[in-house]
């Protein structure tokens, strides 16, 4: 069977605090490492989705409703459900990597990077389905 957990693939988080949220694989580790001897992936996802906007709303209200809260986390493959979709959101690999979990300041920076890139993509109007809450 081919490897399908690749960077850019959209996954659904199944377990934990962010379960039911959509995320994108930033880096996948199929063979595991010494500290995590199982296949896992570094993902960046959306914690709080942007709210619905209409034409009648003003600029300020639209700006407020278009905010996104993101998360960066390492997940076991068992806790991720891959979808057939992929998005090409260019996250900076020097900022968003596995080393960010050692230092809270770096983690904040990585989360900020993901937030900025997600909001940028949301404002262009591409990948609309990615920025909508999963209805379940």
Curated annotation (Swiss-Prot):
Gene3D superfamilies per record: 2.30.30.770
Origin: domain of life: Eukaryota
Pfam families: KOW, Ribosomal_L27e
GO cellular component: cytoplasm; cytoplasmic side of rough endoplasmic reticulum membrane; cytosol; cytosolic large ribosomal subunit; cytosolic ribosome; extracellular exosome; focal adhesion; membrane
Principal cellular location given in the protein's record: cytoplasm
Family: Belongs to the eukaryotic ribosomal protein eL27 family.
UniProt-recorded name of the protein: Large ribosomal subunit protein eL27
Organism: Homo sapiens (Human)
Lineage per the UniProt record: Eukaryota, Metazoa, Chordata, Craniata, Vertebrata
């Amino acid at each position: 069977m081919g490897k399908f957990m690749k960077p850019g693939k959209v996954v659904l988080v199944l377990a934990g605090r962010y379960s039911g949220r959509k995320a994108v694989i930033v880096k996948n580790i199929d063979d595991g490492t010494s500290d995590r001897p199982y296949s896992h992936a570094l993902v960046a996802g959306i914690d709080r989705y942007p709210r619905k906007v209409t034409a009648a709303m003003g600029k300020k209200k639209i700006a407020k409703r278009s905010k996104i809260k993101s998360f960066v986390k390492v997940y076991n493959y068992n806790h991720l459900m891959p979808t057939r979709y992929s998005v090409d959101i260019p996250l900076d690999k020097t900022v968003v990597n596995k080393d960010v979990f050692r230092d809270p300041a770096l983690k904040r920076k990585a989360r900020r990077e993901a937030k900025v890139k997600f909001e940028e993509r949301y404002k262009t109007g591409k990948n609309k389905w990615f920025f909508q809450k999963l209805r379940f």
